[in-house]
Amino acid sequence: MSFFAPRNKKTEQEAKKSIPWVELYRPKTLDQVSSQESTVQVLKKTLLSNNLPHMLFYGSPGTGKTSTILALSRELFGPQLMKSRVLELNASDERGISIIREKVKSFAKTTVTNKVDGYPCPPFKIIILDEADSMTQDAQAALRRTMESYARITRFCLICNYMTRIIDPLSSRCSKYRFKPLDNENMVKRLEFIAADQAVSMEPGVVNALVECSGGDMRKAITFLQSAANLHQGTPITISSVEELAGAVPYNIIRSLLDTAYTKNVSNIETLSRDVAAEGYSTGIILSQLHDVLLKEETLSSPVKYKIFMKLSEVDKRLNDGADETLQLLDLLSSISVVC
């Protein structure tokens, strides 16, 4: 076939396969947003009144912050006006003072007139600043002035993981909405729906492993599911595949680390620490998983757990400062053997 010959358009099914599942199953309406009932209820009332304030969405990653404001914008303006009425800047965009003064300001000051039947189309635009907590304080200060100057025709939605990193003059001008981590039940239902829709077969316990490895981050869980489905291509997804894709340490290794520490045999502790490090497992991830297992360890008293968790935090701090991972794991296990 000639290079310049006309190509057949992708079928709807082929186009669907090429879209990342995170985007394919992103909520399109506020009703589809899961586990954020109070926030959705308040936003629905603003739809009826057309009186939308500046907003600050904060909470853990993958809880639906960006999806919620996009769904709200879609219900306000409809798909036709989304491009002209909504400006989204995320972490991949430069958001220094120059961008705030030029791109954001030029979009904010343009007036709006056109409407679409069937949608409220209030007389303002929406500017979405994703991961606003990564903006410099100077850029945030410049944004404050822009928010004040164009409040009549523009609404801002700041999205962040940590509200404390937003300067007070900016956060005080916004209505704040906390997005809580998704509960396991809703995550399981959504993942099972996606797996059924994509005709993906899974071994028992895989969905729970996805929830566990993602730590309440729905976006991460869906990405792991798609990666595992691509890896297996028709064969059932296994728990070990999910753990490997997520970079998680298998439970039997975590259990072995604790059991060896309980024996108080220094030689065995040193050997196992070196073996685990040689396997390439991240000590930071091991700390996180040890913490979760120790929380449920019924054989340990609260004072003992307290001492271990204090040591965990100390080792975590050293790792962040660049300390050797093998030595830190050895130090942690030795400390556990002493206090138990």
UniProtKB/Swiss-Prot annotation:
Pfam families in UniProt: AAA, Rep_fac_C
Q: How does it assemble?
A: Heteropentamer of subunits rfc1, rfc2, rfc3, rfc4 and rfc5 that forms a complex (RFC) with PCNA in the presence of ATP. Two other complexes exist where rfc1 can be replaced by either ctf18 or elg1 to form the ctf18-RFC or the elg1-RFC complexes respectively.
Listed under GO biological process in this entry are: DNA repair; DNA strand elongation involved in mitotic DNA replication; DNA-templated DNA replication; mitotic DNA replication checkpoint signaling; mitotic DNA replication leading strand elongation; UV-damage excision repair
Where, in this chain's numbering, is ATP bound? 59-66
Q: Would I find DNA-binding among this entry's keywords?
A: yes
Q: Which UniProt keywords apply?
A: ATP-binding, DNA replication, DNA-binding, Nucleotide-binding, Nucleus
Please describe what this protein does. Answer: The elongation of primed DNA templates by DNA polymerase delta and epsilon requires the action of the accessory proteins PCNA and activator 1. Subunit 2 binds ATP and single-stranded DNA.
Q: A GO molecular-function term, please?
A: DNA binding
Cell location: Nucleus
**Which gene codes for it?**
rfc2
Acyltransferase keyword on record: no
List, alphabetically, the GO terms of the cellular component aspect.
chromatin; Ctf18 RFC-like complex; cytosol; DNA replication factor C complex; Elg1 RFC-like complex; nucleus; Rad17 RFC-like complex
Q: Which family does it belong to?
A: Belongs to the activator 1 small subunits family.
Name of the molecule in the record:
Replication factor C subunit 2
